[in-house]
Amino acid sequence: MDSAIDISSDSDVEIQETRTRPQHPPRIAEGSHRRDLSTLRPHFLSGSSSGANGHTKTGLTNLDSRNGFESKPLPRAEHHTHIPGNGSIVTSRIPNISVGDYEKFSSQQAFKRTHPPTFSRPPFPPRPDIGTSNGNASHFRGGAHDDLGMGRVTNGTRILPPSVAHGTSASPSHFNGLSDPMHRNGIGEERNSENDERLIYQAALQELNQPKSEVDLPAGLLSVPLMKHQKIALAWMFQKETNSLHCMGGILADDQGLGKTVSTIALILKQMHEAKLKSKNSGNQEAEALDLDADDESENAFEKPESKASNGSGVNGDSGIKKAKGEEASTSTRKFNRKRPAAGTLIVCPASVVRQWARELDEKVTDEAKLSVLIYHGGNRTKDPIELAKYDVVMTTYAIVSNEVPKQPLVDDDENDEKNSEKYGLASGFSINKKRKNVVGTTKKSKKKKGNNNAGDSSDPDSGTLAKVGWFRVVLDEAQTIKNHRTQVARACCGLRAKRRWCLSGTPIQNTIDDLYSYFRFLKYDPYAVYKSFCHQIKGPISRNSLQGYKKLQAVLRAIMLRRTKGTLLDGQPIINLPPKTINLSQVDFSVEERSFYVKLESDSRSQFKAYAAAGTLNQNYANILLMLLRLRQACDHPQLVKRYNSDSVGKVSEEAVKKLPKEDLVSLLSRLESSPICCVCHDPPEDPVVTLCGHIFCYQCVSDYITGDEDTCPAPRCREQLAHDVVFSKSTLRSCVADDLGCSSSEDNSHDKSVFQNGEFSSSKIKAVLDILQSLSNQGTSNSTQNGQMASSSQQPNDDDDDDDDDVTIVEKTSLKSTPSNGGPIKTIIFSQWTGMLDLVELSLIENSIEFRRLDGTMSLIARDRAVKEFSNDPDVKVMIMSLKAGNLGLNMIAACHVILLDLWWNPTTEDQAIDRAHRIGQTRPVTVTRITIKNTVEDRILALQEEKRKMVASAFGEDHGGSSATRLTVDDLKYLFMV
């Protein structure tokens, strides 16, 4: 066996073992003459140049400028290498090396990622026998038809570029990695952004239309057949993983309910099947080399061996999915990765859908192809990275990733004002100049941890198990979770080490174009993974010329994103046949008492806003302004939500613990709660606000995910204090203790407990509208009649673009509950609200009217949520599910329901769309009716208009609308509009 030779001049460790015969450098056969290889430049790199066949090609310079790409001349090569005995001069940026080393060097370094996947390839004669010495094999030989020799690979490890490794002949343009800096050369020099953009633009030109190539899995892998659009997704994803220059992975942005989960499972099975075939076909010719796809240049390559599943069952205690049997990684893998074991696929998803992923992997994969699966969740999860690396698929939550993986640093040019304005959805003119002081409870241990923030350092003692393995693939489900690149969870996800990276999201843009930067950074999509380049190349053109800027963004996205909506056509037919979805906008009116209350509240809020504007303190009071908006929105649901109704959810444990705190701490914590802060999780003014012992403010529902879950550390930035019920306090609890210490009465705080609503005060115009709908549905279910239950008509003509371009969606002016064709199942309804206080009021109304229901919100444990979903789906007597929009809009499959009611409006219409698609998705057999209940002549009218602006912005970014730019954030003008100033 030849000794290992290190030929890398940067931080790569590139090693090749030849067990059967030496590997020869690539050969270029030539009949009667030799050519200067420096002239073999791709035709698109200049205005006109000679191609491989001698014909003149017209450049794309003008097209570049029209689409916002900078058309700068490419720099010429800097080094020249003479190949003895050949007479050819190879122009290259590769440093001069000895002739003896060149043979080994050329096969590994000179061809590292040398061409984009979409280059057209002219037909060539059959490739010579691989590995056969023919003539002077140590030198290049040019010819009219060029070809390459290559070494065989094992376990899917690539030695040469993808097209070569997969047996495809290469055109002369492929060799320009030797002469052009546009290609990644493995010598530590990055590509110029202009060159990167040329490649991206070239790829976009090749993919102007939706992909149509299909790939199916071999029989016996999936228990369900792939639909046509899923076969197309599989072909596209597999191509991106094996033959992509830009990044190994991408964004699958199909609409909710189109089966992104199944497409991803198919990709996992496809790759593992291909790896097994390569292993069998390699025979005894085994050449181990650095995998050129490893995304981290400073780390050794890691390759996940083929499936290690064995007979058995269980997913971390759950039956039905096979466990790994504990095999060790291959010798070569261990040799290259003494520090970082090679693992399989990591799926990161919200806690509410972890078990749904497990069910999909169990039900959709056949017993013969069963994957070894681990749910990495719970206090008893393994701490051994070698154990973690035994599984084909590992599923975990964003909270665990945020806690275990060292965070990538913030981008360099984040100004304080910009950070806060982007964080809270405000324009860049807003700022906050308040410093947060650490109140109580910060221990020396936690301070030490906070200072230890070496991004990506797996040797960091604070790094968890997830950071101590090298993943073959990382999949972010509901990837919009990382849309804010400044959050801990986004920076932690970017710190994961992986060779392939995927973002799954039906709504990749929710607030601003900046949402995309976080995906680009995670995917390592150069040059846009650098924030300065992202701003210069994408945000700048959009701000200067929205029409051309959005066209460029579409081209940038086309290279890495596949997006289909439910209205997309394939061969003239809908991409999927779903029952129709009807969206009703029902505008009801206040009662006299409610209108009087709202008018007074709106007048006071408008006066306060004008006072801030007159004093020039809008920026400093942005939290108070958002709080005033919150109160106006809540007043549209129920006046009692504004009148400080507090369920005091923190309970007795908190009440006992707060009595033990010093008085100065009580006063400090209460002062924080009363200063109108922002929730550290959802970045909105908190509903049912609570404060932790470490001094951070949350909605009780938001922080409950951490208290009741397994990640019991504070989610606030740079804080790792432990959370429990006895360190979370509500305003009423703190006021009560402070009043007791001061000898004051706290009766004011207790004047709005639940007993108030049990005396008939829990109803409101919206709740009455909900009961009318449910009564109408109950009558339909009992009599199977075809009569329609009518509600109040809408006074607003819906906009034609008010939905997401779904061809099967009808938007009507009046809320009419059309009868659903009976298929033997009961008619069930989901009721969404943003506020748990409103869910409490709806719950009391349902109880009073003897309507069987289940509830799902963020304060419930995962087990309780799962039980509620199962009972709603399977129990025919349970007709209603009341759900928090925060907890129920992601990932859940609720096709048992065919009616959806939205009680209040969210700033982002995509969040509402996600909630609706819990019911309108694959598997639904009945028409789905959606009712959005709003109040006439209130702030909700203006929110509807702002939602429409956001829809236009998203449509412009994706090329789904030919309109121009739209406002993308809450600007000062937006706020003036909302307050009618």
Swiss-Prot record:
Belongs to the SNF2/RAD54 helicase family. RAD16 subfamily. The keyword Zinc-finger applies. Pfam families: Helicase_C, SNF2-rel_dom, zf-C3HC4. Residues 439-451 have a biased composition (Basic residues). The keyword Acetylation does not apply. Residues 181-194 have a biased composition (Basic and acidic residues). This is Helicase-like transcription factor CHR28. It is found in: Nucleus. It comes from Arabidopsis thaliana. Residues 799-808 have a biased composition (Acidic residues). Its EC number is 3.6.4.-. Interacts with SUVR2. GO terms for molecular function: ATP binding; DNA binding; helicase activity; hydrolase activity; zinc ion binding. GO terms for cellular component: nucleus. Residues 1-66, 112-194, 293-337, 439-462, 779-808 are annotated as: Disordered. Residues 46-65, 166-176, 779-798 have a biased composition (Polar residues). Keywords: ATP-binding, Chromatin regulator, DNA-binding, Helicase, Hydrolase, Metal-binding, Nucleotide-binding, Nucleus, RNA-mediated gene silencing, Transcription, Transcription regulation, Zinc, Zinc-finger. Residues 241-526 form the Helicase ATP-binding domain. Residues 804-976 form the Helicase C-terminal domain. Residues 119-128 have a biased composition (Pro residues). A zinc finger (RING-type) spans 679-718. GO terms for biological process: gene silencing by siRNA-directed DNA methylation. ATP binds at D254, D255, Q256, G257, L258, G259, K260, T261.
